[in-house]
Amino acid sequence: MSMVYMNIMMAFTVSLVGLLMYRSHLMSSLLCLEGMMLSLFVMAALTILNSHFTLASMMPIILLVFAACEAALGLSLLVMVSNTYGTDYVQNLNLLQC
């Protein structure tokens, strides 16, 4: 396994650990999710380029579309929560209430 793949897998792992450890603020969770999506995109693009598998060449673009939708939805949720509660603490949220 080359060093590039190991670095990308390490970036994904660090983002995952950051998501699991620093769950107190919504903004830090969103940044960790974006890091995970970026490392998945780079890994998919490099794998497709190295294997010359042309049928799957649309997969990284579809992953970017989902990442953009996730970022837009997360930022709109962050704005709504910060306007309602005045902070982005995740502990203050109760998702069972409307």
From Swiss-Prot:
EC number, as in UniProt: 7.1.1.2
Keyword set includes Mitochondrion: yes
Swiss-Prot/TrEMBL catalytic activity: a ubiquinone + NADH + 5 H(+)(in) = a ubiquinol + NAD(+) + 4 H(+)(out)
A single BP term in Gene Ontology: ATP synthesis coupled electron transport
Gene3D superfamilies attached to this UniProt entry: 1.10.287.3510
Topology in the lipid bilayer: Multi-pass membrane protein
Keywords: Electron transport, Formylation, Membrane, Mitochondrion, Mitochondrion inner membrane, NAD, Respiratory chain, Translocase, Transmembrane, Transmembrane helix, Transport, Ubiquinone
Pfam families per record: Oxidored_q2
Record PTM N-formylmethionine, positions in chain: 1
Segments traversing the membrane: 1-21, 29-49, 61-81
Major localisation: mitochondrion
GO molecular function annotations of the record: NADH dehydrogenase (ubiquinone) activity
Subcellular location: Mitochondrion inner membrane
InterPro entries associated with the record: NADH_UbQ_OxRdtase_chain4L/K, NUOK/Mnh_C1-like
GO annotation, cellular component aspect: mitochondrial inner membrane; respiratory chain complex I
Function text: Core subunit of the mitochondrial membrane respiratory chain NADH dehydrogenase (Complex I) which catalyzes electron transfer from NADH through the respiratory chain, using ubiquinone as an electron acceptor. Part of the enzyme membrane arm which is embedded in the lipid bilayer and involved in proton translocation.
PANTHER family with a match to the protein in the record: NADH-UBIQUINONE OXIDOREDUCTASE CHAIN 4L (PTHR11434:SF0), NADH-UBIQUINONE OXIDOREDUCTASE SUBUNIT ND4L (PTHR11434)
Subunit note: Core subunit of respiratory chain NADH dehydrogenase (Complex I) which is composed of 45 different subunits.
Family, similarity comment: Belongs to the complex I subunit 4L family.
Protein name per Swiss-Prot or TrEMBL: NADH-ubiquinone oxidoreductase chain 4L
